[in-house]
Amino acid sequence: NPRTSSRPLPSGRASKNFVLLLLFFSISIYLLSCWLICDFVFILSPIPLLLFIVYPYTKRFTAFCHFFLGLALSIGPIAGGVAATCDLTGLYLTLPIGIFTFFWISGFDILYALQDYQHDIRNGIFSVPSIYGINNAIKISSVCFIISLIAICYYSFIYTFNFLSILIILIILMNYIFQIIHSLRNNYSFFKYNSYIGILILILVISDILFI
């Protein structure tokens, strides 16, 4: 892919051996950290690893590969809750954020794949844009954004309803609208702005603690 050819591994700036060594140490530290937290967390620790290993290969057989990425990242807030309690008692708090993350990342990744539309078609790579077309991809992404917004509104109104939470939701909504409107242009700008959403969600969760 010409778009990703300058990245460290494709460009040769990072050797395969170095990347494999880095991967080995990263996984080792991750598993050790899970083991130190508690047995329950350690037992569940292979699940995120499996999802991140499988995700890149999903582009070879399903257009819904974006949702595998969304699933892999949506485990983050849920796993954080499990790590904090070593059980599933906090699931009612973390599940709405997990659902938000799933649809937010899936919707964004669909729009992000628009820039590889021609390349994916030529090389037989599966994605929502390459299989269902650009217009349908934007529609599916919009539905994902709407569902994610409903999920975070639910979390906000139930647990953190205050002026700050309303402001954050409005900013996220405007960000979504911006992404959809500019989805056929340079993806870098809304990739940058999209990265700020995670920070906004962190502020939203912190406000839950401050305003209780």
Feature locations, PLM:
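Intramembrane alpha-helical segments
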Residues: R7-Y92, P96, N175-S189, Y196
